[in-house]
Amino acid sequence: MNNLAAVILAAGKGTRMKSNIVKVMHPLGGLPMVSWPVNTAREAGASNIVLVTGHQSEKVQDFFEGQSDVRFAVQEEQLGTGHAVACALPALLGFSGMVLILCGDVPLISTATLKAMVKQHRSRHAVITVLTADFAQPNGYGRIVKDGDGFIKRIVEEKDATDAERRITEINSGIYCVESDFLTVAIPNLKNDNAQREYYLTDIIKEAANLGLLCQAFPVADPAEVMGINDRAQLAEAGQLLRGRINKALMLDGTTLIDPQTTYIDRGVRIGKDTTIHPNVHISGDTEIGNNCLIEPSVVIKGCKIGNGVTIKAGSVMMDAVIHDDVAIGPMAHLRPGTELKEHVKIGNFVETKKIVMGEGSKASHLTYLGDAAIGTNVNIGCGTITCNYDGVKKHRTVIGDDVFVGSDVQFVAPVTIGRNSLIAAGTTVTRDVPPDSLAIARAPQVNKEGWKLKKK
């Protein structure tokens, strides 16, 4: 639909959030709240998106920097929704077609609903289509007033409504589809003669109806889609609904979630078939997980690429790591950015890694720190091993060749290189390179003083 544009209203501060962060930038499902209607408009076919910002405009614009289909308009003073759209009109100069008007704090609207609304708008040759919902308790919403044929005559804000109008349960969602030619004529005619002294976008409905132009309602199938977010309680409720959508889609696509209500997966995460995820798992960022994986409870994964057949045991934390096929991790392992584990690697409990590549079949089973290291294939890292990578000024690298056996309680004082097929004896502090096929041992000889304990009594 290249004749479809969108205006997203996101200028409000959101005082009820009681936050130093502007409302539309609060995170929801791994993204700022405002990015949800922007993405939905894009998925519905809008190729020209105008984001109207106000409070903390720079922060909002910085997030969308580089998205070529998003332009910005600034509403310096918040004088109502009609004024906000007026601020957006210069960015739509030369555009002719349909304009979707969405709210930055109504993030649950679905692509399917917008597409259906646009389709009906086009097929009935409407000038304005209003997305409406029926609420048993419509307090706080504008009411839809219709004529005898069921078309919209006007929308009345609650503060300006009569008692009879307040009893109407069909409400205005704040989402519209409007013909651009009419919008550019009607917006400059708005007046602020109302209780709020604001320029109401809804007044264009009355003008269109007075001109005999078709203004229709499009009732939303699921009223939750038009839920507005004004405080943190509503933000949490919206997050729960979004998680439900995300998790249901994953399950229908072949992923097993043991308890979807306590599984937290962000939009855009990709998970393969026959992967099982246990409760209290958090997966976010640009994460991709392969087929036939097992993720045990209380695992945190952010921005990782994970292959097939990977097991991640309880309590492990991973960020910006690359995990190849058939790797076992945890429990209670910590994989920091720059970690790459090749096929059949084992990382056990209380092992921390950072900026390492670990070759196929290698293992570090317990209580180890591996940082700034290249580790070959089939290497055994003993319990208590540490790569001493920092000298107080800069980081240094440890290189361990293939088939090396590292005993327990070994320290590698980097920079150091260990040749292939070597053995590092338990308790050794390695300060120099070790040639291939060698034994390295650096510890004080054992001394037994017989009878020493008895003399102390």
Swiss-Prot record:
Record-level GO cellular component terms: cytoplasm; membrane
Which pathway does the database say it acts in? Nucleotide-sugar biosynthesis; UDP-N-acetyl-alpha-D-glucosamine biosynthesis; N-acetyl-alpha-D-glucosamine 1-phosphate from alpha-D-glucosamine 6-phosphate (route II): step 2/2; Nucleotide-sugar biosynthesis; UDP-N-acetyl-alpha-D-glucosamine biosynthesis; UDP-N-acetyl-alpha-D-glucosamine from N-acetyl-alpha-D-glucosamine 1-phosphate: step 1/1; Bacterial outer membrane biogenesis; LPS lipid A biosynthesis
Q: What is its EC number?
A: 2.7.7.23, 2.3.1.157
Q: Which CDD domains match?
A: GT2_GlmU_N_bac (cd02540), LbH_GlmU_C (cd03353)
| GO molecular function term, any single one | glucosamine-1-phosphate N-acetyltransferase activity
Region span, Linker: 233-253
PANTHER family found in the cross-reference section: BIFUNCTIONAL PROTEIN GLMU (PTHR43584:SF3), NUCLEOTIDYL TRANSFERASE (PTHR43584)
Q: What is this protein called?
A: Bifunctional protein GlmU
The organism is Geotalea uraniireducens (strain Rf4)
